[in-house]
Amino acid sequence: MKYIFSITFIILGFTFFSQCKGLSKKCIKTIGDGYMHTGQTSALELSEGKKFQFVAIFYEGQNYRISSCSDILLGDLQLTVRNLNRQLFYDNHGNGSTSYDFKVSNTQKLIISLIAPKKESNNNLASSEDIIGCVTAIVGVRL
């Protein structure tokens, strides 16, 4: 019985990882003309109201675009960019934008956060903890 549960868990894990990897590939295609993917990509499964963060390095004098994508089930993500001192550089909350373009004046690490919106609960629907989807953030540099 333990063997069956172990195999099932492994198969489901690979399935979810593959779905998020597929979303990342789609998001890379939408980064836009004039930008090249830097290889700094992060993807994860996220439930409503939860936050995902990762740190990326940005180099002096370069123009960058950070693009976010999510499963349709999760809706529009909130994208924030902060420095390591937690000073806010960008927040798309309320404007519906899925990308942020900027130029870096000095080489630095920035914290990129993706926050899945929390939807109003309806007694007829499953709880928000039951809704899980993939999110990804792609970093591109202007050519």
What positions do the PLM features span?
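Bacterial Sec-dependent N-terminal signal peptides
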Residues: M1-S24
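Short charge-dense sequence patches
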Residues: K2, C27-D33, I57-Y64
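Acidic, Ser/Thr/Pro-rich low-complexity intrinsically disordered segments
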Residues: C20, E45-N122, V141-L143
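C-terminal edge strands of extracellular/lumenal beta-sandwich accessory domains
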Residues: C20-Y35, I115-L143
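Local beta-strand/beta-hairpin segments that build beta-sheet-rich folds
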Residues: D33, T38, Q87-D91
